[in-house]
Swiss-Prot record:
Enzyme Commission identifier(s): 2.2.1.9
Cofactor(s) the protein needs: Mg(2+); Mn(2+); thiamine diphosphate
Homology family: Belongs to the TPP enzyme family. MenD subfamily.
Designated name of the protein: 2-succinyl-5-enolpyruvyl-6-hydroxy-3-cyclohexene-1-carboxylate synthase
Cofactor mode of binding and number, as noted: Binds 1 thiamine pyrophosphate per subunit.
Gene giving rise to this polypeptide: menD
Gene Ontology BP term (one): phylloquinone biosynthetic process
Pathway entry: Quinol/quinone metabolism; 1,4-dihydroxy-2-naphthoate biosynthesis; 1,4-dihydroxy-2-naphthoate from chorismate: step 2/7; Cofactor biosynthesis; phylloquinone biosynthesis
Function noted in UniProt: Catalyzes the thiamine diphosphate-dependent decarboxylation of 2-oxoglutarate and the subsequent addition of the resulting succinic semialdehyde-thiamine pyrophosphate anion to isochorismate to yield 2-succinyl-5-enolpyruvyl-6-hydroxy-3-cyclohexene-1-carboxylate (SEPHCHC).
Pfam annotation, one family: TPP_enzyme_N
PANTHER family: 2-SUCCINYL-5-ENOLPYRUVYL-6-HYDROXY-3-CYCLOHEXENE-1-CARBOXYLATE SYNTHASE, PROTEIN PHYLLO, CHLOROPLASTIC
Length: 583
């Protein structure tokens, strides 16, 4: 063995990290603290196989780990000390569960005899995250026994599996340690144990063999083939293999001759050449009530989560079509509680044996959708192309055309995700979009984006000012971060999304409690964190900064907008793009 083990905690932590290394763990985020010392030291000693990244703030660290897991589609471990430290992981744990991301939460704890007696930095850490983990357990105290070392190894093997199957999500292990925590002698004679411990024999067969759920191909239901008034909704999705995912949706669309209403947060819009029946302006089309009635479907296939659009949701709720949801998770993805059947498979697992694509003429219903898309798309593009003022909605439209191919993009919640849904233009850039749409919070925005960008291609974050301010501790990661992140900051000095809600008409209390202007000088803020800042003066200026992107560092490109003008622009235009589009 590479290390002379001086106490049982050190050996226990070695077994712990060595097992995870052999299972395939590549990243461990470590928050500073005393009780977690054995794990921190052991993870550090696993370099370069495991990159151990030290991050001060636990909430930020958890979202950074979440971002890495999203980008790599692999589990990431995060370690903290005892007490309230682990409570700061909670928002990221919720997001990991709701968006199905594998995270391994490792909370160090005091031994049982130091609990419930005011020993200090001790809280009840059992089931700290409620029902959100896929699985959770408290480990036994370290013991110098071969049987217990095998127990530790197999508990980690089981944890690795439960993070990824049957549905990805977080796993929480609470890990008590007695003193001494540092690798110093504790008087225990480990020689007899180490004489029986042969690492290659002990770890034999420990590899990343997590079985991916596999289903026999599901035959296309006959009723789908018989309907000419069906639609496919490509909803919010971050598939591991976006190209295969988009090809599968395109094949289904062309087989059924149904249009694909593709969310801006679906990769389908970034692989537009695959799908001739792609509808990107459905939210705008459905604001024309007469046209929306003519387009009412008999059947709907929803792939992944329901899109954000309230127009789409209300339209489906009004017409109550027969619906199917295709998604392998065990979650209920129908917030409308309609006549819905959940097919627990991936869209790639649909079977086409004996089914031929319909090569006949396009149905009147499909043609109606395609004509509407063409006209509304032209209206949107012409309007935004002529726009010279810095109105925030144009940023999403511009990004969809200007980013380097395959750029990782993190889209913050509130208005950015909605502007992407409204205005993201179909393209063939294969942009890799990421987002926290599990619980839809603004917390952890910057840290998640940095995690997604770490050791990846130069990346972009589009965010509002409040979402960025909510997570400025993420800038503390800058010295650990490897790669580049450009932050497109839409600074409208407050919560622009609330300007679109009925409460905006009530002043007071609107500005104080909903608009919440913070009046922050972002140039000064960036100076504090030693982050590059540039004020963007025009759309041409922004385009010049987007392609190519730098290779290293973090920079903020700030667009100052007026949220009341932005809101008025939306009120004036969103319902008009399809107003004269009655076919």
């Amino acid at each position: 063995m590479p290390i002379a083990y001086k106490n049982i905690n050190q050996l226990w932590a070695y077994i712990f990290t060595e097992t995870l290394k052999r299972l395939g763990l590549a990243y461990a985020v470590i928050c500073p603290g005393s009780r977690s010392t054995p794990l921190a030291v052991a993870f550090a000693q696993q370099a370069p196989n495991i990159e151990a990244i030290s991050i001060l703030d636990e909430r930020s660290a958890a979202f950074f780990a979440l971002g890495i897991a999203k980008a790599t589609n692999r589990p990431v471990a995060i370690v903290c000390t005892s007490g309230t430290a682990g409570a700061n992981f909670y928002p990221a744990v919720i997001e990991a569960q709701e968006s199905r991301v594998p995270l391994l939460l490792l909370t160090a704890d005091r031994p049982p005899e130091l609990r419930d007696c005011h020993s200090g930095q001790t809280i009840d850490q059992m089931k700290l995250y409620g029902s959100y983990p896929n699985w959770q357990a408290e480990l036994a105290l370290p013991v110098s026994d071969m049987g217990m070392l095998a127990y530790l190894r197999q508990t980690l093997v089981h944890s690795w599996y439960r993070m990824q199957a049957p549905t990805p999500g977080p796993v929480h292990l609470n890990i008590p340690f007695r003193d001494p925590l540092a690798p110093i002698p504790d008087g225990t004679d480990l020689s007899y144990l180490l004489a029986k411990f042969h690492p290659e024999e002990f770890f034999a067969g420990i590899t990343d063999t997590t079985p991916l759920p596999h289903h026999s191909p599901l035959s296309i239901p006959p009723e789908w083939l018989q309907s000419q008034r069906g639609i496919i909704i490509a909803g919010v999705a971050q598939p591991q293999q976006p190209q295969e995912y988009c090809r599968a949706i395109a094949r289904l669309s062309q087989t059924l001759q149904w249009p694909v209403l593709a969310e801006g947060l679906s990769p389908v819009r970034n692989y537009a050449d695959f799908n001739p029946y792609l509808i990107s302006t459905y939210d705008l089309i459905l604001r024309n009530q007469q046209l929306a009635t003519r387009l009412a479907p008999d059947m709907v296939i929803q792939i992944g989560d329901m899109p954000t659009s309230k127009e789409l949701r209300n339209w489906i709720d009004t017409h109550q079509p027969r619906r199917w949801v295709i998604d392998p998770s065990d979650q209920n993805l129908d917030p409308l509680h309609g006549r819905t059947t959940h097919l627990r498979i991936r869209v790639e697992e649909l079977g086409y044996q004996g089914v031929e694509e319909d090569k006949s003429s396009v149905s009147e219903y499909l043609q109606l959708w395609c004509n509407a898309e063409t006209k509304v798309r032209v209206n949107v593009d012409e309007t935004l192309d002529k726009m010279e003022d810095l109105v925030e909605c144009k940023a999403a439209w511009l990004l969809s055309q200007m980013l380097p191919p395959e750029t990782p993009l993190f889209i913050a919640n509130s208005m950015p995700v909605r502007d992407v849904e409204f205005f993201w233009k179909p393209n063939n850039l294969r942009v890799r979009s990421h987002f926290n749409r599990g619980a839809n919070g603004i917390d952890g925005t910057l840290s998640t984006a940095l995690g997604i960008s770490h050791r990846q291609q130069s990346s972009v974050l589009i965010t509002g000012d409040l979402a960025l301010l909510h997570d400025t501790n993420g800038f503390l990661i800058r010295n650990k971060f490897v790669g580049h992140l450009t932050i497109i900051l839409i600074n409208n000095n407050g919560g622009g999304i609330f300007e679109m809600l009925p409460i905006a008409k009530f002043e007071p209390p609107f500005e104080e409690f909903f608009g919440t202007p913070q009046d922050i000088d972002f140039a000064q803020l960036c100076t504090t964190y030693n982050v590059q800042h540039e004020l963007i003066h025009s759309w041409v200026h922004l385009q010049q900064r987007l392609n190519p992107l730098p290779n290293t560092g973090i920079r903020v490109l700030e667009l100052r907008t007026n949220r009341k003008i932005d809101a008025q622009w939306r009120r004036d235009n969103l319902s008009n793009f399809a107003a004269d589009n009655i076919i």
